[in-house]
C-alpha cells in the first residue's frame, strides 16, 4: 500500500495531473470520464486533481488496503469495532430487503423490525391525536432532548425534510447551557408538549440535566401524575427510565452495535418520524438501503462511496490538504455540514492504527461548511484566493419545492456551478489586466490592481447533483457519506467506530464540578485552570 501511495505522490507532482485548466482544455470528454451516476444522483469529480493513471492507482490502493474485505466484515456483523468488541450494523437498521443479519449467531432483523413497528404505532398515535396529553389536548409540539448523535442527526434531517412535515412542530435541545432549554420552554404549552429523552444509558450529563428541567416544567404546571403522558424515551436503561416516570410502552430501544453518529436510522429518529410520518420515514430508510446495496455491489470505478473515500484519502495523504468544505446549495441542508463534521471527525480523528501504532501520514481532515449562497459572502474568499487549498464538495438539487420561485432556484444553481468553475479555472494575471483595461483603466493602474484580482485556480471540488431533496434522496446522501468515512478509515488503518477522545474531557469535568461549585479547592489543577476558576468565581452572581 505504501508503494502505491508513493506512486500517487510522484504522479500527482506532475503538472499534467494537477493543472485542471489545462486538463479540461486538452480533453473535452473529461467530465464523462470522471463522473459517475447512481440513479438520479450524479457525482462529478472531474474538477479534482486526477487523471486516468491516478484513478487506476486509487483503485489499486483500495484493493491493497482491503476495503472490500472490510466492507463485507461490516455488513456481515463482524465486531470490527474491536476496541469495544462490537459489530457495526447501522446498515441493518435500514435493511429493507430483510435478509438475515447475524450478531453472535442471532438474526437481529426481528428486533429491528419490532422497534420500527413500535415507533410507527407511537408516531401515528401522536400525529393523529389519539394519544393525548394529561389534560386531553392533542400534542402540538415535540421536543427531542439529546446530544451528539442523539441530536445532530434528528436536527439535520428534520430541517432538511421540512416540506414533508405534517405532524407536530419539532424542537431540539442539546446544550447543557440552561439558555437552550429555557428558550425552548418559553415557546411551549405544557398541556400540548411531548418530550423525548434520547440517551442510551440515561446517564448523559447534558441530556439528563435538561430532562430534569423539562420534567419540572411539566410537574409544576400539570402535576406529578402528568409526567407519564408527556414523556417518551429512547434508551436501553429500562430501570432508570422507569424511575424517571416514563412507562414501558413509551420506551424505544436500540443496540450497542449502533454508534451514536450512525443512529438516525434507529429509534433516535423518532422525532423525525413524528414530523414526517412513518411512510416518509420508510422512504428515508429506503434511500439509505439503496446506497448500501450500491456500495456493496458496484465496481470501484462506478461506486460513489468508494470514489468519494478514495479521493478524500488522496486529498489528505497525497496532496496534504488538511481540511474539506461541505457546501450544500440548499438552505434546508444548513445543518448537514455540522452533521458530517461529527460523522467524519469523530470517526476518523484518530492518531493510532488498528495495530496500536502511530498513524503514518495523516488521518481525517477538518470538516466544516455552510450552505450556499451564504458562504459565498463569508469564507469563499479564502477558498478562492487564500494560501491553503481547501477541497470543496457542492450539492445541488435540480428541483426545489417552490414552483412559484423557480427563478430563485435557477439563480441558486447558477451560483453553485459558477463557484465550482471558478475554483477550477481561476483567472490569470493577463486576464485580470485585460478585464481592467477593457473598462478604461490605464495600463499602469491596471498593472498595480491586477495581481489582487488573480485567482490561481486548480482548487479541487466535487459536485453532487440530484433531482429533489426527498426523504429517499436524503437517506441516500447520508449513507453515501457514512460509507465514504468507512472507506477512508480503512485506508487510514484506524478504527472509525470508537470515540475515546470524547472521554477525557468528560472525566475532568466531573472532577471540576465541585471546584466550580466552591465545595473543593482548585489546588492540584494547573495554574491556568486555577486562574480561570478564580476569575469565573469572582464574576459569578
From Swiss-Prot:
Pathway assigned in UniProt: Carbohydrate biosynthesis; gluconeogenesis; Carbohydrate degradation; glycolysis; D-glyceraldehyde 3-phosphate and glycerone phosphate from D-glucose: step 2/4
GO terms for biological process, alphabetical: gluconeogenesis; glucose 6-phosphate metabolic process; glycolytic process
GO cellular component, one term: cytosol
EC code: 5.3.1.9
Compartment list: Cytoplasm
Enzymatic reactions: alpha-D-glucose 6-phosphate = beta-D-fructose 6-phosphate
Active site per the UniProt annotation: 346, 377, 506
Keywords on record: Cytoplasm, Gluconeogenesis, Glycolysis, Isomerase
SUPFAM superfamilies named among the record's database cross-references: SIS domain
Molecular function, one GO term: carbohydrate derivative binding
InterPro entries, sorted: G6P_Isomerase, G6P_Isomerase_C, Phosphoglucose_isomerase_CS, SIS_dom_sf, SIS_PGI_1, SIS_PGI_2
Origin superkingdom: Bacteria
Main localization (coarse): cytoplasm
Catalytic EC class: isomerase
Gene3D superfamilies: 1.10.1390.10, Glucose-6-phosphate isomerase like protein, domain 1
NCBIfam families: PRK00179.1
Family the entry assigns: Belongs to the GPI family.
Function: Catalyzes the reversible isomerization of glucose-6-phosphate to fructose-6-phosphate.
Protein name: Glucose-6-phosphate isomerase
Annotated gene: pgi
Amino acid at each position: 500500500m505504501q508503494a502505491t501511495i508513493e506512486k500517487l505522490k510522484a504522479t500527482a507532482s506532475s503538472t499534467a495531473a494537477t493543472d485542471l485548466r489545462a486538463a479540461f482544455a486538452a480533453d473535452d470528454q473529461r467530465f464523462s470520464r470522471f463522473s459517475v451516476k447512481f440513479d438520479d444522483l450524479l457525482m462529478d469529480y472531474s474538477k479534482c486533481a486526477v487523471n486516468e493513471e491516478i484513478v487506476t492507482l486509487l483503485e489499486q490502493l483500495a484493493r491493497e488496503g482491503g476495503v472490500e474485505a472490510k466492507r463485507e466484515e461490516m455488513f456481515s456483523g463482524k465486531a470490527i469495532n474491536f476496541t469495544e468488541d462490537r459489530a457495526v450494523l447501522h446498515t441493518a437498521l435500514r435493511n429493507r430487503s430483510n435478509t438475515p443479519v447475524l450478531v453472535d449467531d442471532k438474526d437481529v432483523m426481528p428486533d429491528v423490525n419490532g422497534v420500527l413497528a413500535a415507533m410507527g404505532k407511537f408516531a401515528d398515535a401522536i400525529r393523529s391525536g389519539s394519544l393525548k396529553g394529561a389534560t386531553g389536548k392533542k400534542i402540538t409540539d415535540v421536543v427531542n432532548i439529546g446530544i451528539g448523535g442523539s441530536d445532530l442527526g434528528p436536527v439535520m434531517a428534520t430541517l432538511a425534510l421540512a416540506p414533508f412535515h405534517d405532524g407536530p412542530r419539532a424542537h431540539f435541545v442539546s446544550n447543557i447551557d440552561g439558555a437552550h432549554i429555557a428558550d425552548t420552554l418559553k415557546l411551549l404549552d405544557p398541556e400540548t408538549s411531548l418530550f423525548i429523552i434520547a440517551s442510551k444509558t440515561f446517564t448523559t450529563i447534558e441530556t439528563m440535566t435538561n430532562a430534569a428541567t423539562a420534567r419540572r416544567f411539566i410537574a409544576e404546571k400539570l402535576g406529578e401524575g402528568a409526567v407519564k403522558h408527556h414523556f417518551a424515551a429512547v434508551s436501553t436503561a429500562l430501570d432508570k427510565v422507569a424511575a424517571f416516570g416514563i412507562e414501558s410502552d413509551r420506551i424505544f430501544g436500540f443496540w450497542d452495535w449502533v454508534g451514536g453518529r450512525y443512529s438516525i436510522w434507529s429509534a433516535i429518529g423518532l422525532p423525525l418520524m413524528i414530523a414526517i410520518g412513518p411512510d416518509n420515514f420508510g422512504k428515508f430508510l429506503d434511500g439509505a438501503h439503496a446506497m448500501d446495496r450500491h456500495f456493496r455491489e458496484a465496481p470501484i470505478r462506478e461506486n460513489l462511496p468508494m470514489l468519494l473515500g478514495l479521493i478524500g484519502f488522496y486529498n489528505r495523504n497525497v496532496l496534504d490538504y488538511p481540511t474539506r468544505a461541505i457546501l450544500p446549495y440548499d438552505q434546508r441542508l444548513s445543518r448537514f455540514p455540522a452533521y458530517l463534521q461529527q460523522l467524519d471527525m469523530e470517526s476518523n480523528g484518530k492518531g493510532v492504527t488498528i495495530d496500536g501504532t502511530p498513524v503514518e501520514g495523516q488521518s481525517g481532515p477538518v470538516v466544516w461548511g455552510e450552505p450556499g449562497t451564504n458562504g459565498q459572502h463569508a469564507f469563499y474568499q479564502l477558498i478562492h484566493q487564500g494560501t491553503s487549498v481547501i477541497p470543496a464538495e457542492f450539492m445541488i438539487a435540480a428541483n426545489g419545492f417552490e414552483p412559484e420561485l423557480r427563478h430563485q432556484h435557477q439563480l441558486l444553481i447558477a451560483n453553485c456551478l459558477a463557484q465550482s468553475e471558478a475554483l477550477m479555472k481561476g483567472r490569470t494575471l493577463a486576464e485580470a489586466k485585460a478585464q481592467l483595461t477593457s473598462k478604461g483603466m490605464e495600463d499602469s493602474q491596471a498593472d498595480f490592481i491586477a495581481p489582487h484580482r488573480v485567482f490561481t485556480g486548480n482548487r479541487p471540488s466535487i459536485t453532487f447533483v440530484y433531482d429533489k431533496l426527498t426523504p429517499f434522496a436524503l437517506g441516500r446522501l447520508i449513507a453515501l457519506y457514512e460509507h465514504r468515512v468507512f472507506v477512508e478509515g480503512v485506508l487510514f488503518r484506524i478504527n472509525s467506530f470508537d470515540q475515546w477522545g470524547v472521554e477525557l474531557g468528560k472525566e475532568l469535568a466531573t472532577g471540576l464540578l465541585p471546584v466550580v461549585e466552591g465545595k473543593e479547592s482548585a489546588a492540584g489543577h494547573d495554574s491556568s485552570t486555577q486562574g480561570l476558576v478564580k476569575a469565573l468565581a469572582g464574576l459569578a452572581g
